[in-house]
Amino acid sequence: MEYAEVMTELESLGKERTKKMYLSNGAVEPLFGVTTGSMKPMRKAIKINQDLAEELYASGNYDAMYFAGVIADANAMTEADYDRWMDQAYCFMLADWVVAVTLSEANIAQEVADKWIASGEELRMSAGWSTYCWLLGRLKDDKFDEDKLSAMLEQVKETIQDQPERTKHSMNNFVYTVGLSYIPLSEKALVVAEEIGELVIEREHKKPQTLNAYASIQKEIERDRIGFKRKYVRC
């Protein structure tokens, strides 16, 4: 499929209800309102196509940008490419669910994510922490440096309260994900989560959201899900 065909298909798959939901979460026009599940047939037909992904991402259409992440060749993209995509990621859904997800399948994932975490920019920091969440939820524990992750937990504990709202959300999710998916530090994550306590995240045009990583990890313990790993992160 070529660019025009994909855009026509995405438009036909759009739903007004989904569009309203995306708009309420920070997406802006142009967009069609396509659910991720509706994209799967096209994903199977196209598989991986980096050139097409670049065309779609550059369109500025939210649904096209999302689908670009689905068909992107994660390891063909350089650090500069990921930075360019982040420059265009205008909302958390693109930063955390498109760019971070794609980066998490690249060999340079941790290297790039570390720089984003240190950037001081809300969505870049959020995407950096989110990249680690996607990595931890998929890769075996021996693919990570335990000391590094331990230091990152300490960083979250000491700095989370002073971060921008979306960064705060992703840092909290990092603690939860370590607790759920990284057995060597699961107990430490629980302790850190308890020290952090409840977080109230302010959201534009929405009621504040209350997060509690400690309670969430405890629920996973009760469900005997500690050590959970997923096979895929992209739809």
Pin down the residues of each PLM region.
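Alpha-helical scaffold domains
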Residues: 1-235
